[in-house]
Each structure stands twice: as C-alpha cells, then as structure tokens.
Amino acid sequence: VTGAEPEPESEPPHPALGLDEVVHQKTRLALLTVLDEAGRADFSYLKRTLSLTDGNLGRHLDVLAEQGLVQLDKGYAGRRPKTWATITAKGEQALAAEMRLLAALLSRFEAGKRD
C-alpha cells in the first residue's frame, strides 16, 4: 500500500474547447445557418440577408469552401454571372456539432445563474 489517493473522476472537457474556429466565426456561422435553412442560395441573397459586402462575403465563402463545408457553383442567370452556395453534408455535420456545443454552453451558463 503506497498511500496514494485515488484518481479523481475526470470531468468532461469544457464545451468551449470544442468550438470549431472555422465554423464559430460570426459571419461563417451565419452563412452556414442561412444555407442550412435555404439549402442553396445565391451570392446576392446571402449578401442582402446578412448585410455583407461583396469582398467580405466572398472571402468567408472561400474559407468555408476550402474546408469542404459549402460548395460553390458558378453559372449564369440569363447573361448575368451568378454564384450559388450550397451547404455540404460535412457543413451540416459541422453546424450541428457547433450548435450542440453552444447549447451545452448555454445550459452551463443558465445553471450558474440559478445559484
């Protein structure tokens, strides 16, 4: 007998540690949420809905596309060039995981307010 104390039960990691840097950024989280609701949306709709500039929207869509969270398709509506964004299965999974973590954070916050 060494007299060592038993290992304390390990607590699960704090939900904030699991937040995804790519998804959690405000504009990208908003884009994924809008695309999850709409399924597919064109650049103009996203720009108008989220009050973004062309450059800002383009950059955030590129980041999401690079991570495989959205698919960007370019084409034409009549003679006008158009870009459409669609959330991918990976994007849906990432958004759902982020929302679960945010819900866990909210639960912890609300539990702390009752004390």
Regions found by a protein language model. Give the residues of each.
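Short beta-strand "wing" residues that participate in macromolecule-binding interfaces
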Residues: 72
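Short, hydrophobic-biased segments on the C-terminal half of alpha helices
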Residues: 61-62
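N-terminal helix-turn-helix DNA-binding core of bacterial DNA-binding proteins
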Residues: 14-56, 75-86
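Accessory beta->alpha helical hairpin/"wing" motif in late/C-terminal subdomains of nucleic-acid enzymes
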Residues: 87-91
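Amphipathic alpha-helical dimerization/coiled-coil segments
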Residues: 2-16, 33, 92-115
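Glycine-centered, phosphate/nucleic-acid-interacting loop/turn motifs that mediate DNA/RNA or nucleotide
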Residues: 68
